[in-house]
Amino acid sequence: MTIIVTGGAGFIGSNFIFHMLDKYPAYRIVCLDKLTYAGNLSTLKPVMDNPNFRFVKADICDREAVFQLFEEEHPDIVVNFAAESHVDRSIEDPGVFLQTNIMGTATLMDACRKYGITRYHQVSTDEVYGDLPLDRPDLFFTEETPIHTSSPYSSSKAGADLLVLAYHRTFQLPVTISRCSNNYGPYHFPEKLIPLMIANCLNDKPLPVYGEGLNVRDWLYVEDHCKAIDLIIHKGRVGEVYNIGGHNEMRNIDIVKLICKELGKPESLITYVTDRKGHDMRYAIDPTKIHSELGWLPETKFADGIKKTIQWYLDNREWWETIISGEYQHYYEKMYGNR
C-alpha cells in the first residue's frame, strides 16, 4: 500500500504521517509538500530515516511535478492536507488561497484520474458551513447543512469540496471528504489561537484576543482527527462527506484564560483587539454519521488534550521559537501591532 500525503510537513499532515507509519509499518508513505511558511521539514525528522517514508518538495499546483511523482510511485491512496488555511491571511491575500486550495486540488484529481487510485481523500473544514448563532446551542452542523461560507479561506475550501464531488460524479473518481472542527495538538503553527497563546504566554507577551473573545469553537485533538481519517480512507463510503467533531465547545476567551492558568501567567496579559472581518460566531459539528457508520468517537477530552499540548510546547521550545523568528514576526506585527 502506497499513500501520497500532500501537505505532510504541516500540522495535521505530519501528525497523520506519524500515525500511519506507526500503525501500518508495511505501508509506504510519500509526503509531497511545498514547504511554505507553515510547512517545516524539521517536523518530519522522526520519520526521515524510515525506509518506508519519502519526502518530495513540490507544489500541488505544479502539474509536471505532481504527475511525475504519480508516475514514480503509483499510489493506492491520496490524502490531501495541502492548503492555505489561515483565515486572516486569506483576507489579506485571497488569490493565494484560490490557487492552492482549488487549482491544486484539481491537479491532484487529474493525476488520480490518469494513474488510477483506490481512494482520493479531501481534508476539509467545518468553516464551509458558515457559523451558528450563540443563542442556539441546540444547533449543529451536519453533512446536510448547506454550504454558506464567510471568508475567502472557507470559500476556497468549499470550492475544492464541490470540485471533488464533481469529479466523483463525472469521472467516477473514488473520493471521500472530511470536514473537521478546530484542531489542536503538537506541531501546530503558532499563528493559530492555542499555539499562539501558549507561545506568547511563555514569552510574557500580550495575548491578542479578537473582539470580546466570545466566539465559540469545537476543539478536536489532532490525534483523534488522524484516527478518523484513517477509518474513512479504509472503510468510508465512496462519494460521501464525513463530519469530524470533538464534542469540546469553548469560548475563545475561556481557552486563553485556561492557558494562562495552566502556565501560571496573569490574565492581565490578555489584550482585546479589533475583531476579525466577518468573524464567525460559533462552530459546532454533529459527528453522528462517522460514529454510526465507522464507529469513530473523539477519545481526548479538552482538559486532557490542552495539558498534553502545553507540555509539548514546553518540551519543544526550539521547534516553535525558530518558527516565530524572521518572516513570522513581520506578519505578527502586521496583524496585531495596530489593533
Describe the predicted segments one by one.
Residues 65, 96, 103, 146, ...:
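Residue-level recognition of oxygen-bearing side chains
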Residues 159, 163, 167, 197, ...:
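Hydrophobic alpha-helix immediately C-terminal to the catalytic Tyr-X-X-X-Lys motif of short-chain
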Residues 137, 149-156, 186, 190, ...:
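The catalytic Tyr-centered alpha-helix of NAD(P)H-dependent dehydrogenases
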Residues 12, 38-39, 64, 188, ...:
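Residues that form or flank phosphate/diphosphate-binding pockets in enzymes
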Residues 35, 182-185, 215-216, 276-277:
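Short histidine/acidic/glycine/proline-rich micro-motifs that form metal-
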Residues 1-183, 308, 313-316, 322-339:
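N-terminal Rossmann-like NAD(P)+-binding domain of SDR-like oxidoreductases, especially those catalyzing
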Residues 47, 135-136, 190-198, 274:
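A glycine/serine/threonine-rich, flexible loop-to-helix segment
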Residues 3, 29, 58, 195, ...:
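C-terminal substrate-binding subdomain of Rossmann-fold SDR/epimerase-dehydratase oxidoreductases
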